[in-house]
Amino acid sequence: HVDHGKTTLTAAITTVLAKKYGGSARAFDQIDNAPEEKARGITINTSHVEYDTSLRHYAHVDCPGHADYIKNMITGAAQMDGAILVVAATDGPMPQTREHILLGRQVGVPYIVVFLNKCDMVDDEELLELVEMEVRDLLTQYDFPGDKTPIIRGSALKALEGDCIWESKIIDLANILDTYIPEPKRSIDQPFLLPIEDVFSISGRGTVVTGRVERGIIKVGEEVEIVGIKPTSKTICTGVEMFRKLLDEGRAGENVGVLLRGTKRDDIERGQVLSKPGTITPHIKFESEVYVLSKEEGGRHTPFFKGYRPQFYFRTTDVTGYVELPEGIEMVMPGDNVKMVVTLIHPIAMSDGLRFAIREGGRTV
C-alpha cells in the first residue's frame, strides 16, 4: 500500500545487508526517483536493486505507485520467484493490500513473505497480533498458506537509521527469504521447449525448424512433439545445428536449427512449438489478467466491449481471439486492468503464467 514503507524497506535491506555481507547500499531517494521504463511501450516507474545474503544473490523490484505495481506484475517479463508484502502495523491491511495479494495469485507469484512495518510505533502487542491475523486471513482467502507464511515485525526507517535492534529484523527477513523461498529451477533443468520461428527444407536432409531454445536441452535422437495450431504430432530430432555447425545438443538460450525426421515442410509453421513429449498442451480457451495501455502509452483512444476480436501474440505468432468480460463489466477503458476469458480461432501451446500481448492492426493494445 502507498506509504506503508516499501521503498524505505528496499533502502533498509540494501543498507543493512551491504554492511553485513558487502555490496552497495542504495539511498531512499535513489530508489524513489525510479526512472521510467519503456518496456514494450508500457511506461512503468520501477527501481531494480540487487543485494546479497550469505547464501544468495537477489534481484529486487520496487515500484513507487500502485498503478506501476499492477503494470509491472502483469507485464513483467521475468517471473518472480517470491514477493515481500509490506503492511504497516499502524494501518493494517488496506484495500490495495488485498489487490496485491490477488494479483500475486493471478500472475503466479509462488511465495509471499510478510514484513510488518512501523512496529516501533505500536506499543500494543495485541494490536500487532490482530494485524498479523488479518494478513494471514487475507493470504488464505487467495490460496496462499496464511498459517505458514513468515511474518517479520520490523521498522524499516529505524533499521535505515542504524538502530541495531531493528537492523537485526532486516537480517531476520533476509534469512527467511533464504529459507522460505526455494531455489528456482534454472531454465536448463526444465523440460525442452523451442518456439518455432522459421521452417525450411534442405534437399536430401529433410525439414529444419529454427528458433531460440526457451528451456531445457534437445539431444540428437530424442523424440519431440510439435504442438499448437494443428493436431499435435511426434517426430525424432535427427540433428542440431548452430552457426552451420553440427552439434549433439541444443541448450536453453541458444539459437539453433533442429532437423526433424520424416516431417514435411508443410506440416509445420511458425507459432508452433517443439517440446519434450507430454510437457505442454494446446488450448483454445484461457483466462487471463490483462493491462490495457493508456492513450499516452500508444494504446487505444476508446474503450472496447465484450465480443472484441483483436490478435493475441504468443511467443512468435498472432492468433485472432474473441474476448469475454467478467459479469457486470460492460467495457474496458485504456489504462484499466481486467480479467478476461479469451477464445482463440486455433489452439496454441500454453501453460499457466504464459505472457502474451494483444494487438490490433500491428499496434499493441
From Swiss-Prot:
Described function: GTP hydrolase that promotes the GTP-dependent binding of aminoacyl-tRNA to the A-site of ribosomes during protein biosynthesis.
Main subcellular location of this protein, as a coarse class: cytoplasm
Keyword Transmembrane helix: no
EC number(s) given by UniProt: 3.6.5.3
Location in or out of the cell: Cytoplasm
Any matching Pfam family: GTP_EFTU
Catalytic activity from the UniProt record: GTP + H2O = GDP + phosphate + H(+)
Protein name according to UniProt: Elongation factor Tu
PROSITE patterns, per database record: G_TR_1 (PS00301), G_TR_2 (PS51722)
Top-level taxon of the source organism: Bacteria
Primary gene name: tuf
